[in-house]
């Protein structure tokens, strides 16, 4: 049956008056592949496109909004419309966008017009993405329009950076040559966003600003005049990019030297030499430091002016991350040595390593601000190292030992002694979890080969402390008790009673004021703890604390969110597989917690299964059967008796093979060596005994009429030697249960048998219990 669809001409009549669910139904109908028909261009498609153009040219924001969505859906699902009408749609869209941007002040005062402006911008972006990559469309529709679209987006970027920066970033990367005439103007806009308004935006927008600034250096600058002895050298494609990275690096050293007025660098001469070796512009080669910021103004009398240092380093770190992490169409030369040196220098700016200047120790406010600023500078070093380790991985293996030793300086330590200051640790919780993320990335390349175990021991204690849900009410109760002990006037008591009544929830519901830990932080903590448990043997106390944390939090989160996060499942699995020095396993607890998780590791541990190749390999049994044919009775009377003995012996030993019991013949084979085994011919496989209950049943020995034919069963000593056809077989001490076969001849009257004797092959266990049975 042919597919029946609504004609586009009918949709054209409805779309102008449609609202709400009716408009959504029209958009859903436009996704149908039935309309991808070139024969409809002059009929239904032409009518519907004319209606869409009318909506886009309307003065009502709602009609423009509907036209934008209809154009985006139709062009995304109909290649015929895209190829035939993209040029016309793009022209109308950027014309309407220009009218909104030119009157942005009036537009921003109306929520409807502001929403329409954002919809127009996104529709232009969608249409450009659909056109890009198609040669004819790009040449005829996109490239001529970019000279008008780029200035509009640059102007709007000053007001709506989070909206325009992603579009401009793609244009810089995909249409670098077309963007070149606007590079200088765009650089001015980005410089203003970086130096003045950077802290006003969220992290995503800050990252977009830095990425656009980095991609701006894809545009080649005018070639500078080179020296005569350098003119014959070919300019590399990343020359402009590399010079920009070095320009950012050069701005770190003056800021680090400025911290020399706060910290006493003179106590460590190696520190001074290390700072002097940081990247610096070389005047001999004509390197010029591109000053992005104005000179920094810091006054010790105004302690909060020190925050300018932290702000400057933060912006430089974000710019550096963009330069080293963004993909380009050509290979890059990244100065890893200089970047890592900068990060290590930032991590060394700590009161754990260097003391404050003497004149600054007396002022409490200034000291507190300095410590906070230094902590922020150290954190920026961690952020840059985190980006490097993710982008370049094992390329920085050479620097791992120095990086790990520098990271230990980030852990706050009390003024006296080497104890960890957990109060400061809890105040910088997010920063510590970023440190754990960096450690997880670094240790993933080295594992147990890392020698800096002190750092991991400290971080284990810190991690277990931070994942605990705590409140800050401990000091509150102390201050309340102190306030009650102070003598107060009647008015003060009334004010205090009013305040205490408003804060009654603190006393009645203290659990409501507990600081929660985010799930992403749990993931980083669990990944770190799994890494530590897997690669090193921890002290028993830490191992027990990790087990307690994993089990308790798994139960708690399962009750709160209805499932156990994947990171906790991995941590529990690691604890079971690597119990450390603990004698007891938490396997039953872990299996009970993860019974609905379909954990394959626990499934194998609880239900072990041997591979089928081990169960269905009959080769070993056939070799043993051939070896038994060579054994003979020590006191055999005739060839017929020997044949009967061998046959009975094979039946018993076949049963022992089925149960995996080691026999004396196996010991004889091992002593003689593999050479003797190979020389003996292989025999056909015999069928396995069907009745397994007969394997270990001792055969009753019938009383013999003649004492000469009766044989005594004796338990051989571990060092006793027995003769077998002139050969001496030494039976050593065997820890396993040995089944020895002693061939005896018994005579009995068998009416249906041709022979008057029957051979009985009793089974003797080499154990004390068997001695008692023999005596009976």
Curated annotation (Swiss-Prot):
Per UniProt, the keywords (alphabetical) are: Nucleus, Ribosome biogenesis, rRNA processing
Task: Region Disordered: list its residue ranges.
Answer: 699-776
**Descriptive protein name:** Pre-rRNA-processing protein RIX1
Major location (coarse): nucleus
Name the lineage: Eukaryota, Fungi, Dikarya, Ascomycota, Saccharomycotina
Entry's localization field: Nucleus
What role does it play? Component of the RIX1 complex required for processing of ITS2 sequences from 35S pre-rRNA and the nucleoplasmic transit of the pre-60S ribosomal subunits. Regulates pre-60S association of the critical remodeling factor MDN1.
Q: Name one GO cellular component term.
A: nucleus
Q: Which InterPro entries match?
A: RIX1_N (IPR012583)
Nucleus recorded as keyword: yes
Q: Does the keyword rRNA processing apply?
A: yes
Q: Name one GO biological process term.
A: rRNA processing
Subunit text: Component of the RIX1 complex, composed of IPI1, RIX1/IPI2 and IPI3 in a 1:2:2 stoichiometry. The complex interacts (via RIX1) with MDN1 (via its hexameric AAA ATPase ring) and the pre-60S ribosome particles.
Cross-referenced Pfam families: RIX1 (PF08167)
Spans of biased composition, class Low complexity? 736-750
| Originating species | Kluyveromyces lactis (strain ATCC 8585 / CBS 2359 / DSM 70799 / NBRC 1267 / NRRL Y-1140 / WM37) (Yeast)
- Write the gene name: RIX1
């Amino acid at each position: 049956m042919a597919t029946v669809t609504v004609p586009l001409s009918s949709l054209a009549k409805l779309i102008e008056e449609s609202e709400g669910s009716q408009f959504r139904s029209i958009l859903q109908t436009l996704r149908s592949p039935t309309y991808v028909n070139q024969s409809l261009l002059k009929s239904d498609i032409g009518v519907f496109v004319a209606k869409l153009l009318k909506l886009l040219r309307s003065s009502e924001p709602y009609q423009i909004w509907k036209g934008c969505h209809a154009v985006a859906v139709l062009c995304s699902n109909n290649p015929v419309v895209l190829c035939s009408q993209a040029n016309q749609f793009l022209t109308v869209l950027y014309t309407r966008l220009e009218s909104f941007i030119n009157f942005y002040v009036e537009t921003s005062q109306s929520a409807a017009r502001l929403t329409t402006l954002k919809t127009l911008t996104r529709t232009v972006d969608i249409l450009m993405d659909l056109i890009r990559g198609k040669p004819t469309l790009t040449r005829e529709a996109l490239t001529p329009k970019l000279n008008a679209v780029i200035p509009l987006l640059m102007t709007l970027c000053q007001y709506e950076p989070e909206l325009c920066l992603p579009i401009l970033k793609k244009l810089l990367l995909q249409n670098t040559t077309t963007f070149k005439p606007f590079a200088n103007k765009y650089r001015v806009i980005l410089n203003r966003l970086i130096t003045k308004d950077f802290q006003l935006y969220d992290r995503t927008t800050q990252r977009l600003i830095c990425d656009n600034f980095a991609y701006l250096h894809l545009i080649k600058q005018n070639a500078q005049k080179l020296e005569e002895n350098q003119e014959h050298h070919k300019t590399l494609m990343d020359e402009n990019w590399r010079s920009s990275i070095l320009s950012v690096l050069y701005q770190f050293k003056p800021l680090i030297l400025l911290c020399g007025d706060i910290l006493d660098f003179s106590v460590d001469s190696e520190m001074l030499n290390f700072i002097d070796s940081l990247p610096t512009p070389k005047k001999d080669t004509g390197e010029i430091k591109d000053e992005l910021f104005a000179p920094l103004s810091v006054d010790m009398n105004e302690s909060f002016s020190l925050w300018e240092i932290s702000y400057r380093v933060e912006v430089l770190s974000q710019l550096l991350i963009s330069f080293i992490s963004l993909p380009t169409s050509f290979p890059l030369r990244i100065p890893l040595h200089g970047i890592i040196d900068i990060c290590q220098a930032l991590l060394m700016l700590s009161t754990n390593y260097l003391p404050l200047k003497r004149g600054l120790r007396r002022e409490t406010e200034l000291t507190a601000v300095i410590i906070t600023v230094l902590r922020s500078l150290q954190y920026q070093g961690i952020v840059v190292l985190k980006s490097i380790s993710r982008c370049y991985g094992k390329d920085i293996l050479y620097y791992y030992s120095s990086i790990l030793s520098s990271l230990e300086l980030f852990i706050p330590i009390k003024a006296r002694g080497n104890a960890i200051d957990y109060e400061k640790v809890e105040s910088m919780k997010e920063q510590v979890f970023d440190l754990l993320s960096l450690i997880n990335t670094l240790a993933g390349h080295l594992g147990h080969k890392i020698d800096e175990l002190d750092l991991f021991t400290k971080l284990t204690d810190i991690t277990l402390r931070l994942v605990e849900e705590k409140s800050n009410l401990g000091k509150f109760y102390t201050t309340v008790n102190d306030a009650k002990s102070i003598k107060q006037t009647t008015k003060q008591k009334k004010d205090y009673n009013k305040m205490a009544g408003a804060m009654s929830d603190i006393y009645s519901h203290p659990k409501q004021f507990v600081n929660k830990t985010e799930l992403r932080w749990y993931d980083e903590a669990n990944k770190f703890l799994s890494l530590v448990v897997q690669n090193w043997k921890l002290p028993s106390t830490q191992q027990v604390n990790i087990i307690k944390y994993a089990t308790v939090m798994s139960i708690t989160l399962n009750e709160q969110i209805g499932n156990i996060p994947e990171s906790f499942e991995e941590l529990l699995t690691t604890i079971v597989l690597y119990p450390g020095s603990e004698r007891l396993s938490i396997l039953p607890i872990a299996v009970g917690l993860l019974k609905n998780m379909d954990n394959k590791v626990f499934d194998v541990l609880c239900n072990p299964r041997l591979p089928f190749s081990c169960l269905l390999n009959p080769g070993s049994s056939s070799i043993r059967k051939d070896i038994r044919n060579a054994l003979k009775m020590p006191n055999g009377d005739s060839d017929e008796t020997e044949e009967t003995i061998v046959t009975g012996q094979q039946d018993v030993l076949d049963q022992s093979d089925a149960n995996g019991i080691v026999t004396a013949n196996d010991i004889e084979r091992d002593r003689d060596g593999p050479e003797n085994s190979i020389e003996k011919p292989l025999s056909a496989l015999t069928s396995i005994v069907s009745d397994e209950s007969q394997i270990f049943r001792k055969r009753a020995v019938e009383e013999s009429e003649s004492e000469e034919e009766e044989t005594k069963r004796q338990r051989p000593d571990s060092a006793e030697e027995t003769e077998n056809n002139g050969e001496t077989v030494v039976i050593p001490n065997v820890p396993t249960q040995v089944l020895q076969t002693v061939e005896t001849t018994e005579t009995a009257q068998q009416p249906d048998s041709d022979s008057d004797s029957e051979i009985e092959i009793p089974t003797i266990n080499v154990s004390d219990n068997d001695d008692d049975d023999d005596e009976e």
